[in-house]
Amino acid sequence: MPRITQEISYNCDYGDNTFNLAIDIGGTLAKVVFSPIHSNRLMFYTIETEKIDKFMELLHSIIKEHNNGCYRMTHIIATGGGAFKFYDLLYENFPQIKGISRFEEMEGLIHGLDFFIHEIPDEVFTYNDQDGERIIPTSSGTMDSKAIYPYLLVNIGSGVSILKVTEPNNFSRVGGSSLGGGTLWGLLSLITGAQTYDQMLDWAQEGDNSSVDMLVGDIYGTDYNKIGLKSSAIASSFGKVFQNRMTSNKSLENNENKLYSSHESIEKNNGQMFKNPDICKSLLFAISNNIGQIAYLQAKINNIQNIYFGGSYTRGHLTTMNTLSYAINFWSQGSKQAFFLKHEGYLGAMGAFLSASRHSSTKKTST
């Protein structure tokens, strides 16, 4: 089943009554944004990219339900890597379509983010565990538009792309990382056997990383005030795993004659002492802290204060957002700010949708 995100009320431009279906097919997730003709509603669906056949079925069901099955008046705009990888598959599945076009991925991300920043109330917010969620007014309201630029977009999907935006339509990719959502999802599915990303996030929310990570307090016994580190700060992600393994191995070597009566202890010493929720929280912290520090460094290099986090990595997950916010605040000593969005995973698809609305007469292409 697709994951449905809250719809938005917006006065869309329906042009010549073409039903625009904007899709963003990434390495992990496939997203779709559309607006039923004359509904003034934006709707958002997501499904795993590995279920690409189900995604094609989803697009068919959307056309049938929201455009009366009228394929000849339906235009698909594709962005993301899948716009190239699955381009032929799209044509095979939609031979009667009015048009299928591709939209440049990075441009789509920026157009989508600018739209959410300027046009959608209650979309952009800050978050940390102490202050909670704080909504940022749209620039068309009380926020000064000049205060928005320049900014960094840290788009976290399967990997991470960092874009510097100096003004509308003026941006450049300044960095990135291969350690992103795909890394978290891949390693946790391998280690814990979790079946879905949401399950991993649920486990992480209830986990205790202190049983897995080596903390500053484990080394110093207290805070390390000289460099501003609390005892709860992570000194080494997964640092206790190797330490406990070494202790377990020595215990087994010294008690070989007792193995026959210690089955439960053997299982525990072979790794069962580490609970899945604790492992999930530890790795979530490791990946998020790494992304946060890279984002801060790029913001420092480019002299930028505002950092927007997009992509499907956060999913409104409180621990993830708090970790990213903490990293930005800690490394910048409070001089830079992390921002989040309610529809963070749909920036590319939203940008593609807007491009079609502005050019609703696009013809069928074969490029």
From Swiss-Prot:
Lineage: superkingdom: Eukaryota
Main location: cytoplasm
Keyword Chloroplast: no
Principal EC category: transferase
GO biological process: coenzyme A biosynthetic process; ergosterol metabolic process
Entry GO MF terms: ATP binding; pantothenate kinase activity
One Pfam family of this chain: Fumble
Keyword terms, alphabetized: ATP-binding, Coenzyme A biosynthesis, Cytoplasm, Kinase, Nucleotide-binding, Nucleus, Transferase
InterPro entries with a match to the protein in the record: ATPase_NBD, Type_II_PanK
Pathway field: Cofactor biosynthesis; coenzyme A biosynthesis; CoA from (R)-pantothenate: step 1/5
Catalytic activity, reaction form: (R)-pantothenate + ATP = (R)-4'-phosphopantothenate + ADP + H(+)
UniProt-listed PANTHER family: 4'-PHOSPHOPANTETHEINE PHOSPHATASE, PANTOTHENATE KINASE
Remarks, miscellaneous: Present with 6190 molecules/cell in log phase SD medium.
Similarity remark: Belongs to the type II pantothenate kinase family.
Name of the featured protein: Pantothenate kinase CAB1
Species per Swiss-Prot/TrEMBL record: Saccharomyces cerevisiae (strain ATCC 204508 / S288c)
Taxonomic lineage from the root: Eukaryota, Fungi, Dikarya, Ascomycota, Saccharomycotina
Gene name tied to this protein: CAB1
